[in-house]
Structures are given as structure tokens and as C-alpha cells.
Amino acid sequence: MTKNVLSIQSHVVFGHAGNSAAVFPMRRLGVNVWPLNTVQFSNHTQYGHWTGGAIDATQMVELVDGIGAIGMLPRCDAVLSGYLGTPEQAQSVLEIVKAVKAANPRAWYFCDPVMGAVSGCKVEPGIQEFLVRTMPGVADAMAPNHTELQRLVGREIETLEEAVTACRELIARGPKLVLVKHLLDRNSPADRFNMLVVTEREAWMGQRPLYPFARQPVGVGDLTSAVFVARTLLGDSIRAAFEHTLAAVNAVVKATWQAGRYELELVAAQSEIAQPREWFDAWVGDTA
């Protein structure tokens, strides 16, 4: 039976970020997606100018209540949340997750804790604090990048070993799995892009090429979370889902770099989202 994921993220009319980077890849992999947009912007915020705004937080809950009213909420297998437009939306996500799990106790919640960083992503005050304080106790899985992981544990991280320790501290607060979408390891080659996935008993490290963009494309993290969620819903083991994610994201990023584009080449690389031609084996990053 086809799996269904409720994806609560931003939407851009032009380009690929948030749901605009996540929905198509998940569908291409064979997962039904119910997009719930937290904001609707003309384009992503790293252009420096954009129009649009956030959806009302109460309307988010009302929309999910509407799905429940037609008897479809028990079909939801997972909730994926990403960029939130207001602190009130973060509270609405908690209500939505509670409603989904009440309708389907087997459903799980994957939190991509978008906090904003030096990269230019604009996040409203109060959202980071909510994500750090509350979401680890609610999420079944979390997908921070390096900076977000540091904020979640309250200290700097410089090595793989320190990252695994930080992930395990986070796991002790609630989530069963932590996917580090981008890990900065001082011991890794400068031309490699590192990722890490950690559970209570497993830790897998993976690398792909780091492409020399003049401007790094936006939406790579959203794509990463989406592919990992989809492959997990399709029944992959943690390692298999991780390796497929690493390979599929590499295919999209490589196609974007080769085309000289700023926006992700999702359509051009769609066949490799499903069946990547290049594969990158993960290795054990640590054992509990």
C-alpha cells in the first residue's frame, strides 16, 4: 500500500525550497505527499528580496482537522516538518502531530529543525528557542545541520566523535534517530560533504563530493530530509535509506553544478532521485 506523508514546510512560487524542494522527490520515489505550506513566498529568502507571508497558525490546524473530518487522517504514515514562519506555527505543529498519532498510532514525526544561520535563511525570533526546548521531546526523528545540532546541545562540535556524542545526547531527550544533514568534521578532506545518521546503537557516516558553487543552492537540506523520509517509509533499513539519500542528493547537486544553476535541478535529475547512478557506501561512525 502506498505510504502517505504530511509535509509541513515553506513554499516558494519560483525555485526549490521547503515543500517546493521536498514534494516532487518524495512523489518521484513513490510516496503520496500532503503538502501543508507554512509560508508562501515568491522565492526563497537568500535572494535578499521576496514577497508573500506566513499562513495563520490556526488555519494549519483547521486544514488537518478537515482531513480528519473526511476520515482520511488514519492514512497518514508520517509527519515531516521544516521551515516555520511564526512561533505560533510551531505550537500548531505539535497539535497536528498529536492529532495524526491519535488517528494512526503507528505514524511517526520527523522534525527538520530549520533555525536559520549564516547562510541567510530568515527565521522569526522565538522559533529557534521552541525547537531547542520542545521538539526533541516530541519528534521521533530529527534532522539538524551542523549549526542546528550545536544549538540543540548548546556547544560547539568539531569532530565526528563529538557529533556522535551530541546526537546521542539528543536521542536521550526523545528522538530515536538523528540525521545530521551536513557535518563539519575538521578531520575530513575539504572537498568532501559529510553526513551522519545516529541511533542509540548505530552510527553511519557518509561522504559525497563538495561542489565548488559560486553561490550554494538552497533547498539541499529540504531535499535530504524528504528523500530519507521517503526511503524509510518504503521500508529501507537506516543504512540503506541513508546511502540512497546521499546518492540521490549528490545527483541533484551535481546536475545543478554542471548546469551552472542556482536553483536545484530536480526535474533534470529526477531519474537519479529514484535510481542514482553513483553510490557512496556509508561506514560505521561509532558503536554504542
Curated annotation (Swiss-Prot):
Superkingdom field: Bacteria
Cofactor(s) this protein cannot do without: Mg(2+)
Gene3D superfamilies membership: 3.40.1190.20
Cellular component annotations (GO), alphabetically ordered: cytosol
CDD domains, alphabetized: pyridoxal_pyridoxamine_kinase
UniProt cross-references to Pfam families, sorted A to Z: Phos_pyr_kin
Reaction it catalyzes: pyridoxal + ATP = pyridoxal 5'-phosphate + ADP + H(+)
Pathway participation: Cofactor metabolism; pyridoxal 5'-phosphate salvage; pyridoxal 5'-phosphate from pyridoxal: step 1/1
EC number: 2.7.1.35
Chain residues that bind ATP: 112, 143, 148, 181
UniProt binding sites for substrate: 10, 45-46, 222
Similarity comment text for this entry: Belongs to the pyridoxine kinase family. PdxY subfamily.
Subunit structure of this chain's protein: Homodimer.
Role noted for this protein: Pyridoxal kinase involved in the salvage pathway of pyridoxal 5'-phosphate (PLP). Catalyzes the phosphorylation of pyridoxal to PLP.
The protein, known as: Pyridoxal kinase PdxY
Species the sequence originates in: Paraburkholderia xenovorans (strain LB400)
Gene (UniProt): pdxY
